[in-house]
């Protein structure tokens, strides 16, 4: 098999796995567990009956996440804030009232909902808004994270922060390997050296950290600092023949601002 076709097959498999029922998302591999919920008061934990995703509160009634997180045949049934782990009784829980998927991602969304293979990756458009049935109470400690400016697209070499509830096969604690634990990490922006759709932001593990998003982190934010703004949303991972590690593609929020602003 040629390198070109091997690349197409690998990308297709990654995308299909991330949108299927049992593996809907991407982990902060080798990440550091967050010790206090107030460190990321804007982070949301999205769950269906079988899967989980990460999101960011961008208005008092809207959570920004990945399109593939809401395109599963299983709907999101709960959105939790100020929670460090799955099942945390101290968190604040909300019910979703609806979702808005970016138009550019709808071909992949329809395929996922109908359980059909994804024809092509649309990671640059992989953005959705989950609307909440009730406004969050900002007096509770939950915070809204700011959106970027249209020019806020980080250049290659930029150090960034990543946050999410994903699984971590590198965690020495067996109870934390399957995800549902909020972790943070560092990574680096790189030039996308492969064919993409929607002009995503490509991210590689930081040279001294080895941390990347993984299943469960999908929809999680790409941050220039721990306070924001949210520059990107985790879409999916890609393996390239010349690189030893996975490259993670993020949908650029700056490039999707019109959609986001009109739906929050």
Swiss-Prot record:
Example GO molecular function: serine-type endopeptidase activity
Propeptide residue interval(s): 20-27
Record-linked SUPFAM superfamilies: Trypsin-like serine proteases (SSF50494)
EC number: 3.4.21.-
Single biological process term from Gene Ontology: proteolysis
Tissue expression profile of the protein: Acetabular (penetration) glands.
Keyword DNA-binding: no
Signal sequence region: 1-19
UniProt note on regulation of activity: Activated by an autocatalytic mechanism.
InterPro entries with a match to the protein in the record: Peptidase_S1_PA (IPR009003), Peptidase_S1_PA_chymotrypsin (IPR043504), Peptidase_S1A (IPR001314), Ser/Thr_Proteases_Immune/Dev (IPR051487), Trypsin_dom (IPR001254), TRYPSIN_HIS (IPR018114)
Residue ranges of every copy of the Peptidase S1 domain listed in the record: 28-264
Disulfide bonds: 53-69, 192-202
Highest taxon above the source species: Eukaryota
Keywords: Disulfide bond, Hydrolase, Protease, Serine protease, Signal, Zymogen
Active site location: 68 (charge relay system), 126 (charge relay system), 218 (charge relay system)
Function of the molecule: This protease cleaves elastin and thus facilitates penetration of schistosome parasite larvae through elastin-rich tissue of the host.
Family in the record: Belongs to the peptidase S1 family.
Protein name: Cercarial protease
């Amino acid at each position: 098999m040629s390198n070109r076709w091997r690349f197409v097959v690998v990308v297709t498999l990654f995308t299909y796995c991330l949108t299927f029922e049992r593996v809907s998302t991407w982990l902060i591999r080798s990440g550091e567990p967050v010790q206090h919920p107030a460190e990321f008061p804007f982070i949301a934990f999205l769950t269906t009956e079988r899967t989980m995703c990460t999101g960011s509160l961008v208005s008092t009634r809207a959570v920004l996440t990945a399109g593939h997180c809401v395109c599963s045949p299983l709907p999101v049934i709960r959105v939790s804030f100020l929670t460090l782990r799955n099942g945390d009784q101290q968190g604040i829980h909300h019910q979703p009232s609806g979702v808005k998927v970016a138009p550019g991602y709808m071909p992949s969304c329809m395929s996922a909902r109908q359980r059909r293979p994804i024809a092509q990756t649309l990671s640059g458009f992989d953005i959705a808004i989950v609307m909440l049935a009730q406004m969050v109470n900002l007096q509770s400690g939950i915070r809204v994270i700011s959106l970027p400016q249209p020019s806020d697209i980080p250049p290659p070499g930029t150090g960034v922060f990543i946050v999410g509830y994903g699984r971590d096969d590198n965690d020495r604690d067996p109870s934390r390997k399957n995800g549902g634990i909020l972790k943070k990490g560092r990574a680096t922006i790189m030039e996308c050296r492969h064919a993409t759709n929607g002009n995503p932001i490509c991210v590689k593990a930081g040279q001294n950290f080895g941390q990347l998003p993984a299943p469960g982190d999908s929809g999680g934010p790409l941050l220039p600092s721990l306070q924001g703004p949210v520059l990107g949303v985790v879409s999916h991972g890609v393996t390239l023949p010349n690189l030893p590690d996975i490259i993670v593609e993020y949908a650029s929020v700056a490039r999707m601002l019109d959609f986001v602003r009109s739906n929050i």
